[in-house]
Amino acid sequence: MKSTKTVLIAVGLMLACGPAWSQAAPPAPAPARGTRVPQANWWSEAGGDAGGPTRIVWAAQKTPETPYTGPNKPIWHIADILKAHQGQARWEQKVLLNRDFDGRYVQMAPGDKTKCIFYADDRVFGWVYSGQVKMTIDGQEPKTLSKGWVFNVAPRLSYCMETVGTEPVVFYRTAPAGQVPSYPESETPTPVPGYKYVKLKINSTGGYDSFNVPFFNVDEYGASDRRGERFLYDGHTSSNLNIANNITELPPSTSWGHLHQNMQEVWLDVYGSVCALISGEGVVHGEYGDLINANEERWHRATSCPNTGKSIRMAMTPRSKEGQVHYFQTDQPPGN
């Protein structure tokens, strides 16, 4: 009899609460735009360099390690570049050339002005080391950039540069490798061997979004507490402003960082001092304006140099939006 009474009480409670129990649970809030949601079958997720399960894999690494060729070397010191061109009013020094990027340091003399050019499908970007330059980009108000500013010219937007003031301007610039520029109708194209310029029409244009801005003040960014901001990020080109905190000593020599396959990782020191371990080269010490290059399949680990404060390195890599694999040591925590 006791058990029957218990059952009846339970049934009565179910009937009383029935309408509430039968209602569907409220839908889960939608993830923020751009957030990657883990899936049970992770292999079908959109590309990315993080968020999947840890896997142990076999990765191909060149032996001997990938050599540096052409203008590429572990580190270019801006002091050496300036010394090599001492006494010249204007010059260009190629410091990077790979499948994706053609990187150069450039000095323009007072009064110099470039022709307006654009590239069909890729960006031009750079950073001002010293002096002042007026940047004119289609659709943007002309802006005078001084030390510490970066610029990002979207594809199909023509741009011109003009020195401002009585001092030369020195800047770093990355253009798409192996590509010949186009010109607006108002310009006279500079001849290029093996090509002829023909007058055509286009109806494509470029622009900016939350990940891409035409101008960004890195010196101001470095002096602030802000983090995680981008000025350039698309399917072909990525240039992150990687912040590293002050440290008192370098990580142990057993921590190698990570490596990439089939691509270099290049850093321009745009704030503070950067110390980078590159396999086969040891630790290279970068100062403001130096360019550091970790060649394909070489281990690399970048930090601030000990006891020098915060640093920012402008990382230049391809394919970041679709994801780029960071290969880590199996017996160490993930390196930077």
Residue ranges and their predicted role:
Residues 228-305, 310-312:
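Structured core of small recognition/catalytic domains
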Residues 1-8:
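Bacterial N-terminal signal peptides that target proteins for export
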Residues 9-18:
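Bacterial N-terminal signal peptides
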Residues 125, 139-156, 280-298:
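Short acidic-glycine-tyrosine-enriched beta hairpin
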Residues 24-102, 115, 181-244, 257, ...:
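A short, N-terminal "cap"/entry segment at the start of jelly-roll beta-barrel domains
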Residues 152, 166-183, 293, 308-327:
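A short hydrophobic beta-strand segment most commonly corresponding to one strand
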Residues 114-116, 135-136, 153, 158-166, ...:
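Short beta-strand His + acidic residue motifs that chelate non-heme Fe in jelly-roll/DSBH
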